[in-house]
Amino acid sequence: MFAVIKTGGKQYRVVANQVLKVEKIVGNAGDVVNFSDVLMVGEGDNAIIGAPIVADASVTAEIIGQERARKVISFKKRRRQNSKRTRGHRQEITTLRIVEILTGGLKTKTATVKSNEKKAAAPKEVKADSVKETATKTVKKRNVSQKVEAASESKKD
């Protein structure tokens, strides 16, 4: 069975256990990703073409790793202008392994998702006695003549 999925502005023909590289998908290695934008599903001569997507079809994939593609050099030269510019770009890509292709509204198998998220501990209650009040210092505003007097006194010392 094969499927045509849409991700990252491109279309990919995939089969089960296929490894492919796509535009970056947020996630860590071991995470499971579900693609619901299935444009076509087929097996042998039988094919179901969506308009634009196939209803109740999905493709489940596992993220193998995150990496960067080879550097693409962009070079511009303006002749007789003594002007040139070289730039490089490395696109971030995700390597996926297709786990299963589901059609007809079948439920996905419960997949174990490895997550590095730590559960947030409940905030501790703070007793009112332990909270200290901050001391506030009030400063009296001085006018210009007082500032001049204070400056002249500091020079005398």
From Swiss-Prot:
The region called Disordered is annotated at: 112-157
- Keyword annotations for this protein? Ribonucleoprotein, Ribosomal protein, RNA-binding, rRNA-binding
Basic and acidic residues composition bias: which ranges? 115-135
Q: MF terms per GO, please? A: rRNA binding; structural constituent of ribosome
* NCBIfam families associated with the record: L21
Complex formation: Part of the 50S ribosomal subunit. Contacts protein L20.
Protein task: This protein binds to 23S rRNA in the presence of protein L20.
Looking up InterPro entries in the UniProt record yields:
bL21-like, bL21-like_sf, Ribosomal_bL21
Q: Which species?
A: Bartonella bacilliformis (strain ATCC 35685 / KC583 / Herrer 020/F12,63)
Q: Which GO terms describe its biological process?
A: translation
Q: Which GO terms describe its cellular component?
A: cytoplasm; ribonucleoprotein complex; ribosome
Q: Name one Pfam family in it.
A: Ribosomal_L21p
Q: Which family does it belong to?
A: Belongs to the bacterial ribosomal protein bL21 family.
Q: What is this protein called?
A: Large ribosomal subunit protein bL21
